[in-house]
From Swiss-Prot:
Lineage: Eukaryota, Metazoa, Chordata, Craniata, Vertebrata
Organism domain of life: Eukaryota
Role noted for this protein: Probably functions as a 3'-phosphoadenylyl sulfate:adenosine 3',5'-bisphosphate antiporter at the Golgi membranes. Mediates the transport from the cytosol into the lumen of the Golgi of 3'-phosphoadenylyl sulfate/adenosine 3'-phospho 5'-phosphosulfate (PAPS), a universal sulfuryl donor for sulfation events that take place in that compartment.
Organism listed in the record: Mus musculus
Catalysed reactions, as listed in the record: 3'-phosphoadenylyl sulfate(in) + adenosine 3',5'-bisphosphate(out) = 3'-phosphoadenylyl sulfate(out) + adenosine 3',5'-bisphosphate(in)
GO biological process, one term: 5'-adenylyl sulfate transmembrane transport
GO molecular function per UniProt: 3'-phosphoadenosine 5'-phosphosulfate transmembrane transporter activity; antiporter activity
Record keywords, A-Z: Antiport, Glycoprotein, Golgi apparatus, Membrane, Transmembrane, Transmembrane helix, Transport
Residues that span the membrane, as ranges: 46-66, 79-99, 115-135, 138-158, 168-188, 191-211, 235-255, 266-285, 292-314, 317-337
Name of this protein: Adenosine 3'-phospho 5'-phosphosulfate transporter 2
A GO term from the CC aspect: mitochondrion
Length: 369
């Protein structure tokens, strides 16, 4: 605020900074959406949507392909935690580079909060990567689609929440779809192991918590995405490094990867890079068009990932995968619908019956004439 005094006329001029000027230095504009150095705000809404969708599909499809490709390397399956260690190292470097490109490099979120977020991030990504040593990739993706289940269970038992019929129906559809998909996998998959189901279930529980903690911390302290990535993944890197050192899991993993550096470290670099770029487009999609459209796009991406997994990697197939997957998709739709009932208006059963009766009457009248 600037104060200007004029002795001759004796008045005070007060100028209030604009909203853009009053913002934190690391945010250029309220409306600007910058992804990978490109300001999407200069384009039309349709172009922004197409760019974001293309980014999500391209980077995350490559991400999923590389993740399954790494675990298809003979002998790599026991080293899921080491892959997570390497992934956290790359994410920390990417976050540091992005943070250096901003004007404001101060850490805004307290260290204790980052220690909690890092622990949850380790649980989410480490357990998810390790589960691929026991599960088919499509089964893991289907489980990832069902984060609503642990979120609802936590809301009921911890916060005493009550959910509407659409939410309950969504959870039931997801649960039945998961059970059906898992039973199909256990019947035809030669390497099925319940350990993988337990690992991915624990990863889902951590993932259900981490989103709320991250959102609350970033809003409370006005932190940037690059700061969140740098500190949460660098602290998580230390956690995993200590864990692998204490369990003697670091030496064998390093020895194995040194024999095939291109198939391990090379793929891990591309895997981490595409994942880092992919999340940038998802965040841009949420900021411009909202969570409803973002969920729709990411769900389509996951469905495409499952299809490509069956095309590029040889694995047994049964039509139970299709029916159970459709149940999960129905659950996702019901979950999105329950949160956006004012935007999505479905016709009631009464209106549908009335419309059908009117059409029948019109056909009868036409036949009579």
């Amino acid at each position: 605020m600037d104060l200007k005094f004029n002795n001759s006329r004796k008045y005070v001029s007060i100028s209030v900074p604009s909203k853009t000027q009053a913002m934190s230095p690391h945010i250029k504009s309220v409306e600007d959406v910058v992804v990978l150095g490109v300001n999407l705000s200069k384009f039309s809404k349709l172009t922004q949507f197409l760019i974001c969708v293309a980014g999500v599909f391209v980077f995350y499809l490559i991400y999923g392909y590389l993740q399954e490709l790494i675990f298809s390397v003979e002998g790599f399956k026991p080293y899921g935690w080491y892959l997570t260690l390497v992934q956290f190292a790359f994410y920390s470097v990417f976050g540091l580079i992005e943070l250096q490109l901003t004007q404001d490099r101060r850490r805004r979120i307290p260290g204790k909060t980052y220690m909690l977020i890092a622990f949850l991030t380790v649980g989410t990504m480490g357990l998810s990567n390790t589960s691929l040593g026991y599960l088919n990739y499509p089964t893991q993706v289907i489980f990832k689609c069902c984060k609503l289940i642990p979120v609802m269970l936590g809301g009921v038992f911890i916060q005493g929440k009550r959910y509407n019929l659409a939410d309950v129906s969504a959870a039931v559809c997801m649960s039945l779809g998961l059970i059906w998909f898992t039973l199909a996998d256990s019947t035809i998959a030669p390497n099925f192991n319940l350990t993988g189901v337990m690992l991915i279930s624990l990863a889902l529980c951590a993932d259900a918590v981490i989103g709320n903690v991250q959102e609350k911390a970033m809003k409370l302290h006005n932190a940037s995405n690059s700061e969140m990535v740098l500190y949460s993944y660098s602290i998580g890197f230390v956690y995993i490094l200590l864990g692998l050192s204490c369990t003697s899991g670091l030496g064998p993993a390093v020895a194995f990867c040194s024999k095939n550096p291109v198939g391990t470290y090379g793929y891990a670099f591309l895997f981490s890079l595409t994942g880092y770029f992919g999340i940038s487009f998802v965040l841009a999609l949420i900021k411009i068009f909202g969570a409803l459209l973002a969920v729709t796009v990411t769900t389509g991406r996951k469905a495409m990932t499952v299809v490509l997994s069956f095309l590029f990697f040889a694995k047994p197939f049964t039509f139970q995968y299709i029916w159970s997957g459709l149940l999960v998709v129905l659950g996702i739709f019901l979950n999105v619908y329950s949160k956006n009932m004012d935007k999505i208006r479905l016709p009631s059963v009464y209106n549908m019956i009335k419309k059908a009766m009117d059409m029948k009457k019109s056909r009868t009248l036409a036949q009579t004439v």
